[in-house]
Amino acid sequence: MADEGGLETGAHDELKGTEEQAVNFAPSPDFLWLCEQLFAKIDHVQFERANNLLTKPVTARYYEVISNFTTLWRTTVGNNIYPALRLILPYRDRRVFNIKDYTLIKAICAFLKLPKDSSTEKKLINWKQDAGRSVRLSKFCVEEIKKRRSEPQIDRNERITIDDLNGYLDQLAIERTEQGRSFKNLANSDIMNKCLTSMTFLEMQYFFDILLKNRPLGGHEHKLLNCWHPDAQDYLSVVSDLETVAKRLWDPSQRLGNQDLKINIGLAFAPQLATKLHVSYQKIGEKLGWDFFIEEKMDGERIQMHYTNFGSDIKFYSRRATDYTYLYGNNLKTGTLANFINLNKNVKDCVLDCEVVTFDSNNKIVLPFGMVKSSAKNMLSQDGIDTQGFHPLLMVFDVLYLNGATLVDLPYYKRREYLKQILTPTAHRIEIIKSIRANDEQMIKKSLEKALSVGSEGIILKRYDSRYVIASRSDDWIKIKPEYLEQFGENMDLVLMGRDPSKKDSLMLGLLDYEEVIQDSPIMVNSQSSEENSQRFRGFVSLCIIANGISNEEYKEIDRKTKGLWNDSEKIPPLEYMKFGSKVPRQWIDPKKSLILEIKARSLDNTRSSERKFAAGCTLFGGYCRQIREDKNWKTCYTLQEFERAKSGNNWRKRGSSKPQKVISKKRRYNIISSVNKALEDFAELEHRSDIFDGMYFYVLSDYFDGVKRKRIKKSEIQKVIVANGGQLVQNVITRNYNLNDLRIISSRNTVECNSLIVRGYDIISPKWVFDCLLSGKIMKLEPSHCFNFSKQLMDYAYKRIDQYGDPYERDINKYEWSSLTSEKICTTAKQQPDVQFDNSLMDVPHFLFHGRIVFLLSDNNNIQKESFMVDAYGGKVTNELSSANLVIVVGAVTQRRINDIRKQISSEVIKQDHPPRIPDMVSEGWLYDCIKQNTQVAEDNYRLP
């Protein structure tokens, strides 16, 4: 254990020295000055951008405004920017006002003395319906105030300064905590009235933003931090405290070292996170060196506890630096957790990494965190804590700082030893997460089986000798949890690309596509741009259409934020980076100016029609919108590469196909297409390989998606293959110096240009024909699989060349096709079945609500007739075999013992598989009723059982 205060004293002395120099030599500027010199100018740049008035690149203009402001502050005010930072970045400020839109609107209406339920009040409450995309609530409110009040005329010496406003806000935060959060208390606040009567309209606008914790700078926080000091952004991610950043980083010439970017006692930091890998247990074990700890994955909230001065000062911070100290206690005698902490008497300071879960003291079980979300809101007040039979339980798993010394560079096993030495658990209040040391695949399976049998989320594997890496997601920590049947993995943050307007708009969403760039220079560990530099933006590809799960309020919010940005489909979108399939929305929006929606799906739809409809090569089945992601933009949305990895890591089954099913083993399937991939590798270089395409001209319009391996072959790769085998490329079909009979137009996507050529009578060939020619070593006659869009006459000829199973009459099949045909199991009744694709739009019909659901109804009294009828009536199936179910619904009051028995049966499948399993979800009957009520399959998260 480190010496008490040894390292800490030096750190405080150093900080003290810097604090003495971070001072301002001039009086505090007016708040109006801050509004005019920074906020208003940033808004003006946004106005210039929206109206195409910029004479410089928009990023350069933003940096110009912000750099001028920071220079002006240094030269006219001083080196301490903390007073301004609290107002510029209010969402980073520690003060809590508890003011939401409705609270502020009602307080403003009271200030204006408007009658209750007046038209103006209703207009303000429903402001999103009338406000433009770039209009914030603050501006909307000020416009209404202007109509009823004249602007206050304030003498210069009576203006509110930045320091004055910070003082007022400090008092307001105390008032809102002690006197309550109602709008009446805010309306009656002397501070609120003082500000409203002493501010210009410009000041009011940004004052309202500060109260609402909005972003007056938009998304340009990093630009301000970089202009003030080159290390400010990195340092803020470590300490999460504006005051510390301002006091330490006042001189841009003084750079931080690696030691400075480590844990600071009392200041929140971004924790290390576990990675979820879609690989086998064998691969996971290899990554961890076959020496690791196995711990239960707790279903709670990540918390870091900062313990200082022998427990006289304790802080609790969430993963995102939210201060929950008022909730859990600030010393050993207060709160719902702090007063149960029992550390060694020699521990002066320490930082513990933990998870807070909810414990049911009546049934002695840990409750799923999703079940207590509503009660967690009540827990924000002291009266709501430790009631209704459950209370918070702190599960500790790591110690990162001890008596002045950081422990992050110590191996994990050593940190665990320290933790057990310094912390004495208190049953059901403060406990250490149990762990076992493991070194083989069987232990992973058994641990996961045991965790699932008691209703746990899963397990976490941690490398035995791993160090702790702040603000990272490391492969040294790997989480393993099952995927639920009828769900497609993790939630996805998708970008809005288009819509079909109607009574209930259908929104088209897509994925960000990029390609990896090989780095010539080494990547610095602390470089935030290293990941960005290794990826080159390619564009966006359409993935799905979503209409379920979006509330009327969210539709209004989407309309407001995208107002004026929609284009009708007659206007061609920027095809260089917007890729649609055959399904083109009636209106499209530039994804770079669009919104991000969080989507949950039941599974993938891999049918041939879906492959053509969407540029991603498939779509989502049962997609459901969870929320609008205000904290995300197009640069941080879900990528095509992440999507492909998620697909390859799971055996997602096809949906909606009524064609004869061809059952091909995974091994054979990869053998069949290996020669095509080999061809791509062999012809990747532009050296001459053959003369197969000699005398032929090719116009290539799109990439090609390999429907078997789920791999995309880029347009440029197809062109290289053609050139390497004697073909010539053309860039358009209008200007030509060749015979039209020698032209082959190649495409697998209904792009705008492709559709235009189809209308003009051109036949379009699939890229599959190119690769089949290479496999055969000669020009092949066209078969149906080669025809992307052909005239009826040519299609009739193509179908005459194959039998009912797709076997060609006029050419020899290669060994891969032979392997495919001999391994298929052909349905004998295939000829009588119509060749149709299931239309997923039918899922909107109530009778298909539970299509694909095979439900096991669990009840102690077998009184399940009503629920069984409801499942059947809405398109699902009820089964008595748990092994065939993809959903378990618990009906009525079922004993915990019976539920655990079912969980054990489900978890027993874990031991039989080499990958993390897919298991049926288990929900309460409330899920069934809410699905029918909302006419969509709602997310299961809030209905899971303890």
Curated annotation (Swiss-Prot):
Residues holding ATP: 295, 297, 302, 355, 397, 457, 462, 479, 481
Gene Ontology CC annotations of this record: DNA ligase IV complex
EC number: 6.5.1.1
Subcellular location: Nucleus
Coiled-coil boundaries: none
Superkingdom field: Eukaryota
Positions annotated as active site in the UniProt record: 297 (n6-amp-lysine intermediate)
PROSITE patterns, sorted: BRCT, DNA_LIGASE_A1, DNA_LIGASE_A3
A family per Pfam: BRCT_2
Keywords, alphabetical: ATP-binding, DNA damage, DNA recombination, DNA repair, Ligase, Magnesium, Metal-binding, Nucleotide-binding, Nucleus, Repeat
Keyword Repeat recorded: yes
Protein residues bound to Mg(2+) 2: 457
An individual GO BP term: DNA biosynthetic process
Obligatory cofactor(s): Mg(2+)
Broad enzyme group: ligase
Similarity comment: family membership: Belongs to the ATP-dependent DNA ligase family.
The protein, known as: DNA ligase 4
Provenance organism: Candida glabrata (strain ATCC 2001 / BCRC 20586 / JCM 3761 / NBRC 0622 / NRRL Y-65 / CBS 138) (Yeast)
Source taxonomy: Eukaryota, Fungi, Dikarya, Ascomycota, Saccharomycotina
